């Protein structure tokens, strides 16, 4: 039950953050909002790291992969923070639902996973659902849609890299 509540709280916080980014986007740039978001995130992170044993627990055995993960995560966050004030959130969310398609496709070369026809079928059905939500046949593609797609791809790479890094570097491996 605790996991369900944690997930619900996390989703509510992400939705609140996205709405705040949209609302504050006319007054603040993406970098300013990213800085504030990161500063707020540092407070609970400080207590988590401190409780787990200090800075030694965040030392990575894969620093280059970790650096690439940080860059792709930064690119994703910047892309979303740039786009949210400039286009309807519902459209940005719908485009970002392409992430599972990217993740499954990236898991094959990056993680060496074998993806069977059932999983590909499920991903394709989900992607068709995304297309139905977007109704691309009724609108022209705006360049901001491409920014969301790039941010989504960057997010997907970051997520797959996190899984790859977890194979060699864990909190206990420091």
Which residues does each predicted region cover?
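Hydrophobic/small/kink-forming positions within alpha-helical transmembrane segments
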Residues: 11-19, 46, 70-78, 100-105, ...
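C-terminal transmembrane-helix exit sites in multi-pass transporters
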Residues: 99-121
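Transmembrane alpha-helical segments that form core, pore/gating elements
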Residues: 22, 30-31, 45, 140-174
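Specific transmembrane alpha-helical segments of multi-pass solute transporters/efflux pumps
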Residues: 16, 53-90, 132
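Membrane-interface interhelical linkers
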Residues: 1-9, 42-68, 117
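Juxtamembrane helix-entry segments on the extracytoplasmic side of multipass membrane proteins
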Residues: 1-2, 35, 58-62, 135-154
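Structural motif at transmembrane-helix junctions in multi-pass transporters
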Residues: 26-32, 79-96, 167-172
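Hydrophobic transmembrane alpha-helices of multi-pass small-molecule transport proteins
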Residues: 118-134, 155
């Amino acid at each position: 039950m605790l996991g369900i509540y944690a997930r619900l709280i996390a989703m509510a916080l992400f939705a609140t953050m996205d709405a705040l980014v949209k609302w504050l986007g006319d007054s603040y740039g993406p970098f300013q909002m990213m800085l504030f978001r990161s500063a707020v995130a540092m407070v609970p992170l400080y207590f988590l790291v401190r409780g787990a044993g200090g800075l030694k627990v965040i030392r990575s055995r894969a620093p280059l992969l970790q650096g690439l993960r940080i860059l792709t995560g930064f690119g994703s966050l910047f892309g979303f923070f740039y786009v949210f004030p400039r286009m309807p959130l519902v459209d940005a969310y719908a485009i970002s639902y392409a992430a599972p398609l990217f993740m499954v496709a990236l898991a094959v070369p990056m993680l060496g996973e074998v993806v069977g026809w059932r999983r590909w079928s499920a991903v394709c059905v989900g992607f068709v659902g995304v297309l139905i939500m977007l109704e691309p046949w009724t609108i022209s593609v705006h360049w901001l849609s491409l920014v969301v797609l790039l941010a989504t791809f960057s997010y997907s790479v970051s997520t797959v890299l996190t899984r790859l890094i977890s194979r060699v570097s864990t909190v206990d491996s420091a």
